[in-house]
A protein has these predicted regions:
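Amphipathic coiled-coil/heptad-repeat helices and related helical stalk/stem segments
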Residues: 11-14, 57, 101
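Asp-based phosphoryl-transfer active-site loop
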Residues: 23-40, 132
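Short coil/turn segments at beta-strand junctions that form active-site/ligand-binding loops
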Residues: 24-26, 69, 117-118
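A positional/architectural concept
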Residues: 36-66
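Short, flexible loop segments at the rims of nucleotide/cofactor-binding pockets, characterized by
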Residues: 5-7, 12, 48-51, 96-97
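Mg2+-dependent phosphoryl-transfer enzymes with acidic/Ser/Thr/Gly-rich catalytic loops
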Residues: 47-54, 81, 88-89, 93-95, ...
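Non-catalytic pre-domain segments flanking phosphatase-related domains
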Residues: 1-30
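Substrate-recognition element of Asp-dependent hydrolases with the DxDx(T/V) motif
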Residues: 61-85, 95-96, 132
């Protein structure tokens, strides 16, 4: 009985700390493939790569922007589709073809006058692990790589934004 109370108390404390951390956020950085897409790529016979972005994610990004959060895309892959999606959403920062994600993220923070404490990152794969020291909140989708799921602060259980 006492152990159950302690567990509930700890979860309330963790939720309080998480809410406090969320209030400090000014920048949300999103990986693209596997976060804003399902991770699959279609390739045409001519070699063109096609990605599918979900409209609901776009709405969620716009709502976050309206709430005053700066949203940026950061991807290891170079993609015209990603850059077009960023333009459509009115994102000022779309970094593609990035080989060193922590350095690129730290540079973006400097440009915006922000610290890691004001930054959250959503990633899905092993190449997203190195950003951990430069963000306050590391998050991943439920189907992310297991090593990433083990170290994140939160796992997104669904791909849909809830109002």
């Amino acid at each position: 009985m006492n152990g159950g109370w302690l567990a509930r108390g700890r979860s309330r404390l963790a939720a309080w700390r998480c809410r406090a951390r969320l209030r400090q956020l000014k920048l949300l950085v999103l990986d693209v493939d596997g976060v804003l897409t399902d991770g699959g790529l279609w390739t045409t016979e001519s070699g063109e790569v096609i990605k599918r972005f979900d409209v609901r994610d776009g709405l969620g990004i716009r709502l976050l922007q309206q709430a005053g959060l700066e949203v940026a895309l950061l991807s290891g892959g170079k993609s015209g589709a990603t850059e077009q999606r960023a333009r459509y959403l009115g994102l000022q920062h779309c970094l593609t073809g990035v080989k060193d994600k922590p350095a690129a993220l730290a540079n973006l923070q400097r440009q915006l006058g922000l610290t890691p404490a004001a930054t959250a990152f959503v990633g899905d794969d092993l190449n997203d692990l190195p950003v951990r020291p430069v963000v306050a909140l590391l998050v991943c989708p439920a189907d992310a790589a297991a090593p990433l799921r083990r170290i994140v602060r939160a796992i997104l259980k669904t791909s849909e934004f809830a109002p």
